[in-house]
Regions:
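Histone-fold recognition with a strong bias for associated Lys/Arg-rich disordered tails
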Residues: 1-148
Length: 148
């Protein structure tokens, strides 16, 4: 991942996810860490609420999943999970197709929520919208601001 190709907002979320991963002593940064960081973000919480999503339920699912991840005592920096890496690349491609100079947090969030990891499949059982609904909402929000 190249942080210089991401917005400040996404950089903060990625750093927060890394710190969560380290706090839990997990060997790789994965969707659970990212979603813990995403769900702390007011803008993402607002979008989910507007889509009639129970954010607290998603937080509970995320926390439960985080607690079940393998941990180790290694002091090495964690690696990036395959699903996060693939989601990042797909979101970067999407942002370029839209003509964006930087990858924003909302685009990565949307792509990652609909990837094939077992965690995001579990999360999707707790939402009532599809990827198109989420992308439409994000595009309306992003058109008003370049901070995402």
């Amino acid at each position: 991942m190249e942080l210089e190709k991401t917005t400040e907002k996404l950089q903060k979320i990625l750093i927060k996810a890394l710190n969560i991963c380290k706090d839990y002593h997990n060997p790789e940064i994965c969707d659970e860490h990212m979603f813990k960081a995403y769900l702390d973000d007011d803008d993402i919480r607002k979008i989910l609420s507007e889509l009639k999503c129970d954010v607290n339920e998603l937080i509970n699912v995320t926390n439960n999943s985080l607690n079940s991840l393998p941990s180790n005592d290694s002091t090495n920096d964690p690696s990036i999970s395959r699903y996060l890496y693939e989601s990042y690349n797909e979101a970067l491609k999407l942002s370029r197709e839209k003509g964006d100079k930087y990858l924003g947090a909302l685009d990565l969030f949307a792509v990652e929520l609909f990837n094939d990891s077992s965690f995001t499949k579990l999360l999707r059982k707790h939402i009532k919208f599809n990827k198109k609904d989420l992308m439409d909402k994000i595009n309306r929000v992003v058109s008003k601001s370049s901070l995402y």
